[in-house]
Amino acid sequence: MQKRVVILLLDSFGIGASEDAKDFGDLGANTLGNIAKACFNNLADSNDRSGALKLPYLESLGLGLSALKAANELPLGFQSQPNLIGAYAYAQELSSAKDTISGHWEMMGAPVLFEWGYFKDKTHSFPKEILDEIVRKTKIKGYLGNCHASGTEIIKDLGEKHLETLYPIFYTSADSVFQIAAHEERFGLDNLYALCEEAFQILEPLKIARVIARPFIGTNRESFKRTANRKDYAIKPHKKLLFETFIEEKRGEVISIGKIADIYAHVGITQKFKAGSLMELCDVTLEQVKNAKNNSLIFTNFVHFDSDYGHRRDISGYANALEYFDARLKEVLENLRENDLLILCADHGCDPSFKGTDHTREYIPVLFYHKDLQPAFLGKSESFADIGQSIAHFLGLSPLDYGKNLLNFKGQP
């Protein structure tokens, strides 16, 4: 029997502070719950949306009930007895961090049980010897930033100075990351990518998970904006991924949409599709759901929930994007094939109502749909790896080293 798996990952869509949230300073975080509360109280109204958060298709897959189990309260405005068509769980992260790479790697069988390297100082964040080596090896004349910053704010603050000097802007965050912003036209996209590649080679021994190219355009503070040509340079996963097993044992196709390929350092990816906006990500995903051959795994990361709304602490924007996604989810459901398994999940939280601008340590929703899957609560997962293990079971692959299978189809003992 030919099967397909479709994974839709809503980047940063947490559903309540996890049991270890206190260790991360994230007690009280609840991305979905706090967005729903703001919407219900008309605090997230805008020209684009108003009133309670309306996510009927996500609710039908068990989103609200998953959040109820995770946070002990139903998101405001959600139904306590929706017309349930999916099976649902919620998951605690096993990995030692709350970043994109850790969450994604864990769900494909490679939890991060070591400590990433971090740049913890808010100013003068990077060691001088590292900066000196980057300058020496790349022949840039200097750099700006060298601090923790919001990516959109730092190009407003330093973009004009960057255009005067052509010094790249170096910055970081609470994540294990070294980010480089530069003007796409004046500095040059190829030059930015080459700089990031060199910086990645220098930083890899320090276990810095990612170097990210952040190109932008514009002529002044008011017009600067980031482009869709972001590129992530990531450390390769330390364990064999589900993708690789699927290719080796079933000659499967692994189709990356958005930044998935970069997150996994292109390991086990057979096809890659980029997309710039949330609409484009939905369009490309729907196209692949319609056209990808059997024996495929389609995996999309919907980054904008995190980058445009979570980190920016934009509750109304996050709510509007969720409602747009939910409407497009209807199209995905309508185009699934007989033996498709649909999975919706997240990689961490990024509560737009919470203090600061960083990710939040939260439980994630794990929602499944298949025609032969009984709608039911599947319990609490102690690792995101349960997602990968369930996929391995569904596809008839060798089991992963981590995680347990959550799925029991009609007709199975």
Swiss-Prot record:
Q: In which pathway does it act?
A: Carbohydrate degradation; 2-deoxy-D-ribose 1-phosphate degradation; D-glyceraldehyde 3-phosphate and acetaldehyde from 2-deoxy-alpha-D-ribose 1-phosphate: step 1/2
Q: Which UniProt keywords apply?
A: Cytoplasm, Isomerase, Manganese, Metal-binding
Binding positions (Mn(2+) 1): D11, D347, H348
Q: What is its main location?
A: cytoplasm
A GO BP entry is: 5-phosphoribose 1-diphosphate biosynthetic process
Alphabetized InterPro entries for the sequence: Alkaline_phosphatase_core_sf, DeoB, Metalloenzyme, Phosphopentomutase_DeoB_cap_sf
Catalytic activity entry = 2-deoxy-alpha-D-ribose 1-phosphate = 2-deoxy-D-ribose 5-phosphate; alpha-D-ribose 1-phosphate = D-ribose 5-phosphate
GO CC field: cytosol
Entry-linked NCBIfam families: deoB, PRK05362.1
Q: Which PANTHER family match?
A: PHOSPHOPENTOMUTASE
What HAMAP family is this protein classified in? Phosphopentomut
Functionally, this protein is described as follows: Isomerase that catalyzes the conversion of deoxy-ribose 1-phosphate (dRib-1-P) and ribose 1-phosphate (Rib-1-P) to deoxy-ribose 5-phosphate (dRib-5-P) and ribose 5-phosphate (Rib-5-P), respectively.
What is the name listed in the Swiss-Prot or TrEMBL entry for this protein? Phosphopentomutase
The gene name reads deoB
